[in-house]
């Protein structure tokens, strides 16, 4: 899924750089309808497959990450969400974890929270994600919210947390300052 007006830019860049033999299919989101809308747009592409959603403004790094991703690709049912501790949880969707290391609550950009575990932009879902997304109601922002989708999986005891392993990190590069910080991290 790409935002309105960006489709040709992505085609131009990715077509030139696609030397690894993969086929890329694009769907343009014509208006802001939220992250779960990507699954509705891609319903025919997804069919009976499981899917991953990776937000383009996120940077992930870590030696153990490859092994974790390979395990998540083998997902048979349910959903996996990657969590990472942050200093300012009110800027992110946050997950509360209980004593059994299960997600007990998901809150979108809480003013106060007992957790510092941000929900990163890396998700794995079984093929029920399309059906679950169809049942979501738009939020006050008139968008389908990823937190609501995750809560649907959680309420059915089908959501598991993944933690970026030791030596790994996640950086949100959604604004210019964060992008600059990620650039400095990579160059150091």
Predicted regions and their residues:
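A structural signal for short hydrophobic beta-strand segments in well-ordered beta-sheet cores
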Residues: 95-97
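Conserved beta-strand termini and adjacent loop/short-helix elements that scaffold enzyme active sites
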Residues: 27-29, 82, 162-164
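Short coil/turn connectors at secondary-structure junctions
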Residues: 20-23, 47-50, 56, 75-79, ...
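Conserved donor-nucleotide/metal-binding helix-loop-beta segment in metal-dependent transferases, i.e.
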Residues: 62-90
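Conserved N-terminal catalytic core of the sugar/cofactor nucleotidyltransferase
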Residues: 1-55, 59-67, 175
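Short beta-strand segments
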Residues: 53-56, 82-85, 165
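Catalytic-core segments of class I nucleotidyltransferases/pyrophosphorylases
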Residues: 52, 66, 70-73, 102-188
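A short acidic, often aromatic-flanked loop/helix-cap motif at beta-alpha or helix-coil junctions
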Residues: 31-35, 88-89, 112, 169-170
């Amino acid at each position: 899924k790409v935002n309105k007006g960006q489709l040709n830019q992505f085609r131009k860049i990715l077509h030139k750089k696609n030397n690894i033999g993969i086929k890329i299919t694009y769907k343009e989101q014509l208006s802001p309808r939220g992250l779960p809308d990507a699954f509705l747009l891609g319903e025919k592409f997804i069919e009976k497959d499981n899917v991953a959603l990776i937000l383009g403004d996120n940077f992930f790094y870590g030696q153990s990450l490859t092994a974790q991703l390979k395990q998540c690709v083998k997902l048979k049912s349910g959903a996996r969400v990657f969590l990472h501790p942050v200093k300012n949880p009110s800027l992110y969707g946050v997950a509360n974890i209980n004593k059994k290391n299960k997600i007990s609550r998901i809150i979108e950009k809480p003013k106060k929270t007992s957790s510092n575990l941000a929900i990163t932009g890396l998700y794995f879902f079984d093929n029920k994600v399309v059906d679950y997304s169809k049942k979501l109601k738009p939020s006050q922002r008139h968008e389908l919210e990823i937190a609501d989708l995750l809560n649907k999986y959680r309420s059915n005891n089908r959501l598991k947390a993944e933690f970026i392993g030791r030596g790994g990190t996640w950086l949100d590069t959604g604004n210019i300052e964060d992008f600059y910080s990620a650039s400095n991290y990579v160059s150091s």
